[in-house]
Amino acid sequence: GLPVCGESCFGGTCNTPGCSCTWPVCTRD
């Protein structure tokens, strides 16, 4: 739901729990 997780995912993975990679940033549901 929230657009930003405060993390980028140029490598394709997110370290923040509950976040997924919508390149090039991590997004939350």
Curated annotation (Swiss-Prot):
Record-annotated disulphide pairs: C5-C19, C9-C21, C14-C26
Keywords (A to Z) from UniProt: Disulfide bond, Knottin, Plant defense
Annotated crosslink Cyclopeptide (Gly-Asp) location: G1-D29
InterPro entries membership: Cyclotide, Cyclotide_moebius_CS, Cyclotide_sf
Record bears the keyword Transit peptide: no
PROSITE patterns assigned to the protein according to its UniProt record, in alphabetical order: CYCLOTIDE, CYCLOTIDE_MOEBIUS
Modification after translation: This is a cyclic peptide.
UniProt KW Coiled coil keyword: no
Single biological process term from Gene Ontology: defense response
Domain of life of the native organism: Eukaryota
A Pfam family matched in the record: Cyclotide
The family this protein is said to belong to: Belongs to the cyclotide family. Moebius subfamily.
Domains as described in the record: The presence of a 'disulfide through disulfide knot' structurally defines this protein as a knottin.
Summary of the function given for this chain in its UniProt record: Probably participates in a plant defense mechanism.
Name of the molecule in the record: Cyclotide psyleio D
